């Protein structure tokens, strides 16, 4: 498939704002591929359309930032001054390169047109280049690719290198297109994507005529992590109990979500972003290897513990462990980790369609019970033990007074609150469900992405000291909700400034526009209505709690979350 044919349809998709039209254009693209010589190209097309070369679970990136891309573009013959001016004018490096493509060095008239396979394989190679001269090699490869591209191709190649296509396409739209073209149930393709995290594989299977409902490659598999199921925020324990009828109560831990996979004695541990963190937590791996269980996927919360106080250490200590690459054993001696397991998703077969109560029974057979209402003394001893693997603390009673007592006890031992779960519910990967609720004592902190940064003043003049914060809507579009500068230490500012310089897209002098890659957890006094921002809401007195290196733009809060918190707080007043 010629890359130019692909880009023509991408251009159509980009020019419409209507979701149904985007779906129709992608259906047109599928039909074009279906009748081509290589229908398997749908795999690459599906991934590229959302700005990815690798499947999400592979945890790989092209690894090229805006600065390196700019260097590569300059070597094609485009003057740096013109390039920066055009980026400032258009707000997009892809459009800037397209508009200035007449400056790109010409190649032989007899050179062949770029194919989809060539572009795809070239970009995959970029992620594999390492070593002292890697920057030069990457620059040369990108430059050669742009020299071979026509103007529209150069727009999309530039964006794909930054993994941001800017055409308004997302996974749900591609899944809707699959459903329409292949005449398959939309819920089926959504569920299969949820257990594979591989839109390319799903497209490849559909176009080859596979029976996707029964294809073993499209089932939940060990060592292919899935996105976690997410809880709803609830205004009160009472409201959540009404929604979940005969609920199950568990402690909400102050830690980091992890997924543990084990098969044939091999163990891998993944973060909520599906990152493989196995090498960073060797002591946990060794403990899991000792268990007489195999062919299993477990989910739990990894907590950094202070064994003297029996309370969790700061969340940043967990991130220090997850990010550590050297002297891991020494760090393990300083920061003790444990996992509280609260779900089993696979045990010799997929379990996500079975009720939570059944999954919990399996979990308790493996790790024992931790029933707060009948085993509190045992739990108290375990809190101070050096044991690393537990089942989560659970309350079996629905007595409102006991539930409140359990909630307060969970807070007293340093955790965040409680979870309220429907015991009859299945596990729905990657979705925020109405069968699981979190109850916390204070306003819910928000995870937001930084979209702009501004140079600081006074003591902060050497760093970016103020950050524009955004949340996303259901289509993935970003909406500004405020600016923050408080809560950041000098170490934080230094770290953020370094990242900003690597991901800035446009320089406006004292302010820069960024790729949406920095996630901050912020607290605030309240959410208020505001005409200043398009979304109609703003954070009052936001303050940074921590830099969430364990989260990506996929994990940030949504506009709906903001509206819900606003309504909850308004009803409390």
From Swiss-Prot:
Cross-referenced SUPFAM superfamilies: ATP-dependent DNA ligase DNA-binding domain, DNA ligase/mRNA capping enzyme, catalytic domain, Nucleic acid-binding proteins
Keywords: ATP-binding, Cell cycle, Cell division, DNA damage, DNA recombination, DNA repair, DNA replication, Ligase, Magnesium, Metal-binding, Nucleotide-binding
Any one GO MF annotation of this record: metal ion binding
Binding site for ATP: 250, 257, 272, 301, 342, 432, 438
Cofactor(s) listed in the protein's UniProt record: Mg(2+)
Domain of life: Archaea
Protein name in UniProt: DNA ligase
Species this protein is from: Methanococcus maripaludis (strain DSM 14266 / JCM 13030 / NBRC 101832 / S2 / LL)
Record gene name: lig
């Amino acid at each position: 498939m010629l890359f130019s044919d692909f880009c023509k349809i991408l251009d159509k998709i980009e020019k419409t704002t209507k979701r149904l039209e985007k779906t129709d254009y992608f259906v047109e693209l599928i039909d074009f591929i279906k009748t081509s010589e290589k229908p398997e190209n749908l795999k690459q097309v599906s991934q590229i359309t959302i700005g990815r070369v690798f499947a999400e679970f592979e945890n790989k990136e092209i690894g090229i930032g805006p600065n390196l891309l700019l260097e590569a573009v300059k070597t094609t013959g485009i003057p740096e001054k013109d390039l920066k001016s055009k980026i400032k004018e258009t707000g997009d490096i892809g459009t800037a390169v397209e508009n200035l493509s007449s400056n790109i060095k010409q190649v032989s008239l007899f050179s062949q047109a770029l194919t989809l396979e060539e572009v795809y394989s070239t970009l995959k190679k970029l992620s594999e280049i390492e070593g002292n001269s890697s920057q030069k090699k990457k620059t040369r490869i990108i430059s050669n690719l742009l020299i071979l591209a026509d103007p529209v191709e150069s727009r999309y190649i530039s964006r794909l290198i930054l993994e941001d296509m800017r055409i308004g396409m997302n996974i749900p739209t591609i899944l809707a297109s699959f459903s329409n073209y292949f005449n398959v149930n939309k819920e089926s393709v959504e569920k299969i994507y949820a257990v594979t995290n591989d839109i390319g594989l799903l497209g490849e299977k559909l176009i080859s005529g596979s029976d996707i409902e029964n294809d073993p490659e499209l089932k939940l598999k060990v060592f292919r992590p899935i996105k976690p199921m997410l809880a709803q925020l609830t205004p009160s324990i009472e409201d959540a109990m009404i929604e979940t009828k005969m609920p199950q109560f568990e402690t909400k831990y102050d830690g980091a979500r992890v997924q543990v996979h084990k098969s044939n004695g091999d163990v891998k541990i993944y973060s909520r972003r599906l990152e493989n963190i196995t090498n960073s937590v060797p002591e946990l791996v060794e403990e899991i290897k000792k268990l007489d269980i195999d062919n299993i996927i477990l989910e739990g919360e990894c907590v950094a513990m202070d064994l003297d106080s029996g309370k969790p250490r700061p969340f940043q200590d967990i991130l220090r462990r997850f990010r550590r690459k050297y002297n891991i054993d020494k760090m393990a001696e300083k920061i003790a980790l444990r996992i509280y397991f609260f779900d089993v998703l696979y045990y010799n077969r997929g379990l996500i369609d079975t009720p939570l109560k059944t999954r919990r029974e399996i979990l308790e057979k493996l790790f024992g019970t931790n029933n707060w209402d009948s085993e509190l003394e045992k739990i108290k001893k375990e809190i101070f033990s050096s044991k690393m693997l537990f089942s989560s603390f659970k309350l079996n009673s629905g007595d409102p007074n006991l539930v409140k007592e359990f909630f307060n006890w969970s807070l007293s031992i340093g955790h965040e609150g409680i979870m309220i779960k429907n015991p009859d519910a299945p596990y729905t990967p990657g979705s925020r469900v109405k069968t699981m609720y979190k109850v916390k004592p204070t306003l819910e902190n928000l995870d937001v992405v930084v979209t702009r940064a501004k140079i600081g003043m006074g003591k902060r003049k050497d760093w970016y000291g103020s950050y524009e914060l955004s949340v996303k809507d259901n289509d993935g579009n970003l909406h500004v909700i405020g600016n923050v500068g408080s809560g950041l230490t000098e170490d934080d500012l230094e770290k953020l400034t370094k990242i900003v310089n690597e991901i800035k897209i446009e320089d406006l002098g004292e302010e820069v526009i960024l790729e949406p890659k920095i996630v901050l957890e912020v607290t605030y006094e309240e959410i208020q209505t505001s005409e200043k921002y398009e979304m109609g809401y703003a954070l009052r007195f936001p303050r940074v709690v921590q830099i969430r290196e364990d989260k990506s733009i996929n994990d940030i809060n949504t506009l709906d979350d903001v509206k819900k918190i606003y309504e909850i707080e308004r009803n409390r007043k």
